[in-house]
UniProtKB/Swiss-Prot annotation:
Disulfide bonds: none
Family per record: Belongs to the krueppel C2H2-type zinc-finger protein family.
Protein's recorded name: Zinc finger protein 333
Family matches, as Gene3D superfamilies: 6.10.140.140, Classic Zinc Finger (3.30.160.60)
Domain named KRAB: residues: 4-74, 203-274
SMART domains, per the entry: KRAB, ZnF_BED, ZnF_C2H2
Domain of life: Eukaryota
Ranges annotated as C2H2-type zinc finger: 366-388, 394-416, 422-444, 450-472, 478-500, 506-528, 534-556, 562-584, 590-612, 618-640
Gene: ZNF333
GO CC terms, sorted: nucleus
Annotated PROSITE patterns: KRAB, ZINC_FINGER_C2H2_1, ZINC_FINGER_C2H2_2
Length: 665
């Protein structure tokens, strides 16, 4: 076993020194001086590192860029002043009391090397390497470039049965500083052929990675996650500086790009790239570049809010962080670290290969268990599964309506608040959704980007194009579960269902009359305003609806474009053709819920329902007599305006209805 040096038992702080309070700094000072005394009493090299000399004079060590453990060779035992140091018990009690007040946080990163008292067996000369002289007698430090085990300690609340103090081990390479490399050259010159380090296996990035579980990760704030990112990038750079070939893992690319910890679905930590192969020389930035940029932050220059600290010298392009600067340098240089072998597309990070490979190969690894529909991403599968379960997790607190997605709930809340944040810059009309604003703006520009491939007709909305295409294919995918009637659009099915439920959600503010659709309500409002928009060019009749005008125009032209395929009879309106088609099929989709009697037309069902309710909604204004049908009321009114005399031969008959007998005088 080799001799134990001061570096083996030292507690090294890098960026964590600022997180320590005065009690912990004093504890660190006492601990390092105590280790020096212990090593001196065991016959360790009689030299005191410069950082310990400064610890004896002040409570803080050098900064990271200057705080290298340097062996100066100056006698130091006489300079120790233990009476100036506080009691170990007092420091521990004070530190423990402060620990209880600290919240969850990443506050320490120390090298955990067992002290001399904690070793199972004391060091003997037989355990040391077979050397003729101790290493310090040859004028060298006896240190070697070894992998020191580090541990990140995170206090988090208890998760189940787990210990609230969670620790993850990792190995971080302790690089030889410049002064140590000079001593090694001198050592090799004085003792050629002398072994200075034991043989070790190659260390991969997976060996030095610190991994947190998702439960642990959520308890870290932004400062702690930033510290974690810096530690991981430092580990990688240290490995890259000593390894001949080291490919950047996919997870590290995510870490550089987002500053977030990777998850298991992003890839396993590995020292080799997944297919396709990666070029290590292009994937690893130079250590000089890292040192140059890191020195900016070490000097204490803090960017102001909104200021971009890092600049690329080639184009003076500013950057907020280090990682985009490296990526920009590679983009400017035209480098590409990874290349897809099949489609020959190059990517700067190997993780970017995932999406092109899925698109190219059509990989859809997430399949639905119910309909066997597959998706590329798990988030799409979760969203799709809600269509089967009909799960509506997001409830409106005002009206109780439930929605499947939170975005739909947010849009719905605007109907209660009346908020319309999206306003047209030309006409000032406002909308609740940005998509509706985009569609509205096409009315001003006349843009119709959606064109039918069959007939060339263009539309300004994709939904209008889809509905139009179904007129060519004859597809009616939306079918009523009660009567079996099919529709081309889902909105038409929703309107049709109100004929079964008798729901009329749209009510007139002036007279209170309800309607099934908003279109019918808008038409009704014109009765109060007297507005009539559509005028017949032939007879001058003004109509309130465009569809009514089209039907009216056919009375002048005699056009009957709707022909029955069975008997050849033609009709001027599609509704008349549908009613006629039921005479051939015998289909009666409208059934009475009380007696079960079925009818071929909804109007016949409405009239029949009044026989059960004894409702007579049509009342005469003069005699207040009520009728079930409007036609009966019309016939009744003729008795008040006078009798119509129809002569049949010489016998005058007073008739008010063609099916009624003669009325008494």
């Amino acid at each position: 076993m080799e001799s134990v040096t001061f570096e083996d038992v030292a507690v090294e702080f890098i960026q964590e020194w600022a997180l320590l309070d005065s009690a912990r700094r004093s504890l660190c000072k006492y601990r390092m001086l105590d280790q020096c005394r212990t090593l001196a009493s065991r016959g360790t090299p009689p030299c005191k590192p410069s950082c310990v000399s400064q610890l004896g004079q002040r409570a803080e060590p050098k900064a990271t860029e200057r705080g290298i453990l340097r062996a100066t060779g100056v006698a130091w035992e006489s300079q120790l002043k233990p009476e100036e140091l506080p009691s170990m018990q007092d420091l521990l009690e004070e530190a423990s009391s402060r620990d209880m007040q600290m919240g969850p946080g990443l506050f320490l990163r120390m090298q955990l090397v067992p002290s001399i008292e904690e070793r199972e067996t004391p060091l003997t000369r037989e355990d040391r390497p077979a050397l003729q002289e101790p290493p310090w007698s040859l004028g060298c430090t006896g240190l070697k470039a070894a992998m020191q085990i580090q541990r990140v300690v995170i206090p988090v609340p208890t998760l189940g049965h787990r210990n609230p103090w969670v620790a993850r081990d990792s190995a971080v390479p302790a690089r030889d500083p410049a002064w140590l490399q000079e001593d090694k050259v001198e050592e090799e010159a004085m003792a050629p052929g002398l072994p200075t380090a034991c043989s070790q296996e190659p260390v991969t990035f997976a060996d030095v990675a610190v991994v947190f579980t998702p439960e642990e990760w959520v308890f870290l704030d932004s400062t702690q996650r930033s510290l974690y990112r810096d530690v991981m990038l430092e580990n990688y750079r240290n490995l890259a500086s000593v390894a001949d070939q080291l490919c950047k893992p996919n997870a590290l690319s995510y870490l550089e790009e987002r500053g977030e910890q990777w998850t298991t679905d992003r890839g396993v930590l590995s020292d080799t790239c997944a297919e396709p192969q990666c070029q290590p020389q292009e994937a690893i930035p130079s250590q000089d570049t890292f040192t140059e940029i890191l020195s900016i932050d070490v000097k204490g220059e803090q960017p102001q809010p909104g200021e971009k600290l890092y600049k690329y010298n080639e184009l003076e392009k500013p950057f907020n962080s280090i990682e985009p600067l490296f990526q920009y340098q590679r983009i400017h240089a035209g480098e590409a670290s990874c290349e897809c072998q099949e489609i020959r597309n190059s990517f700067f990070q190997s993780a970017h290969l995932i999406v092109p490979e899925k698109i190219r190969s059509g990989d859809k690894s997430y399949a639905c268990n119910k309909c066997e529909k597959s998706f590329r991403y798990s988030s799409d599968l979760i969203r799709h599964e809600k269509t089967h379960t009909a799960e509506k997790c997001f409830d409106c607190q005002e009206c109780g309506q439930a929605f499947k997605y939170s975005s739909n709930l947010r849009r719905h809340m605007r109907t209660h608040t009346g908020e319309k944040p999206f306003e047209c810059s030309q006409c000032g009309k406002t909308f609740t959704r940005n998509f509706n604003l985009i569609l509205h703006q096409r009315n001003h520009t006349g843009e119709k980007p959606y064109e039918c491939k069959d007939c060339g007709k263009a539309f300004n909305q994709p939904s209008s194009l889809r509905s139009h295409v179904r007129t060519h294919t004859g597809e009616k995918p939306f079918e009523c579960s009660q009567c079996g009637k099919a529709f081309r659009e889902h909105s038409s099915l929703k309107t049709h269902l109100r004929t079964h439920t008798r729901e009329k959600p749209y009510e007139c503010n002036q007279c209170g009359k309800p309607f099934r659709t908003s279109t019918h309500l808008n038409v009704h409002k014109r009765i109060h305003t007297g507005e009539k928009l559509y005028e017949c060019a032939t007879c001058g009749q003004v109509l309130s609806r465009l569809s009514t005008l089209k039907s009216h125009m056919r009375t002048h032209t005699g056009e009957k474009p709707y022909v029955c395929q069975e008997c050849g009879r033609a009709f001027s309106e599609p509704s008349s053709l549908r009613k006629h088609a039921r005479t051939h099929s015998g289909k009666k989709p409208y059934a009475c819920q009380e007696c079960g009697r079925a009818f071929g037309q909804s109007s016949h069902l409405i009239v029949h329902v009044r026989t059960h309710s004894a409702g007579r909604p049509y009342q005469c204004n003069q005699c207040e007599k009520a009728f079930r049908h409007s036609s009966s009321l019309t016939v009744h009114k003729r008795t008040h305006v006078g009798r119509e005399t129809i002569r049949n031969g010489s016998l005058p008959l007073s008739m008010s209805h063609p099916y009624c007998g003669p009325l008494a005088n």
